[in-house]
């Protein structure tokens, strides 16, 4: 029985798991849930994830949630190449640290963006959000080694890219001033372009973004 993957279009956390599943070639049944329809609040989904959030998976009766934990589970369950995490202990520790940094610090800056582009957002909030995000992304410039973050294509790339793709989409649609003059550095901007052209990214592009 194929793994069941519960996703919602546009969620950067669900998107990273979708990217990982496709990258590793893991057979799965995609269940695209709707925030607006209340799909995450149904008794059936709540039994899988009591927190009523995506992503979540069910593998042979084993329910699991939280995107970072799912990524590690996928590599443990299917240790074949391509891997999401390095087999080298130090490289793997670095990847895990970077994912935690994204989930804490990039997510915090992303929250400011959400507030700034909301209906009650102000020009000052946009400026503050741009400053916070730019300062955070500047820390990621040195992390780019070659074409991807932390070396080869990995869980780190699948974590950061969906977050930034969402930020840029919101900015383009609601607050262009947020990205006027650039938000990411030269290396990170080039990395985003490379990521966008990857077949795995194109295949998993959020349906309602197309």
Could you describe each region identified by the protein language model?
Residues 1-130, 134, 148:
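GST-like domain detector, emphasizing the conserved glutathione-binding G-site
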Residues 203-210:
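Terminal-tail/helix-coil boundary detector
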Residues 75, 163-164, 205:
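Active-site-flanking alpha-helical
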